[in-house]
UniProtKB/Swiss-Prot annotation:
Organism: Clostridium perfringens (strain 13 / Type A)
Gene Ontology molecular function: any one: peptide deformylase activity
Pfam families, sorted: Pep_deformylase
CDD domains: Pep_deformylase (cd00487)
Keyword Metal-binding: yes
EC numbers on record: 3.5.1.88
Cofactor note: Binds 1 Fe(2+) ion.
Cofactor needs: Fe(2+)
Name of the protein: Peptide deformylase 1
Length: 147
């Protein structure tokens, strides 16, 4: 495992849409482990692959809810409901914070690091963190959201 260098601010990779992961091979598994280590090293609650310079549909989240790190490969948000507004920040935009309106509840489908499909119902802070990281896969940053 290794800590990866983060991409910051105006790096154009943060604005690009990520590609689907076709094969969860050893390189992808190492990337996931590196992302988890990088997230924790930088005191983050989530990290998406473009933040470490890789345009693949992968993100990791630890919402500090006791579940540990969760891995999402090729995620698809199936449902959104409710509304919440709270302040967000981002490891790629250090020192920047702003209130962002997001769905309060979501249902997301993804693959885990072993290629097993799962569906997760998330709400509150976990739902917010997932939506924030999912946006990164679409080339969207939290500063793009209007209240």
């Amino acid at each position: 495992m290794a800590i990866r260098n983060l991409r910051f601010n105006d790096d154009e990779i943060l604005r690009k849409k990520c590609r689907v992961v076709d094969d969860i091979n050893d390189r992808i598994k190492v990337l996931v482990e590196d992302m988890i280590e990088t997230m924790y090293e930088n005191n983050g609650v989530g990290l998406a692959s473009p933040q470490v310079g890789i345009l693949k549909r992968i993100f990791v989240v630890d919402a500090m809810d006791g579940a540990g790190s969760r891995v999402f490969i090729n995620p698809e948000i199936l449902e959104k409901s409710g509304e919440q507004t709270d302040e967000e920040g981002c490891l790629s935009l250090p020192g920047r914070h702003k209130p962002v309106k997001r769905a309060n509840k979501i249902k997301i489908k993804a693959l885990d690091v072993n290629g097993n499909e799962f569906v997760l119902d998330a709400e509150g802070f976990l739902a917010r963190a997932i939506q924030h990281e999912y946006d990164h896969l679409e080339g969207v940053l939290f500063i793009d959201h209007e209240l």
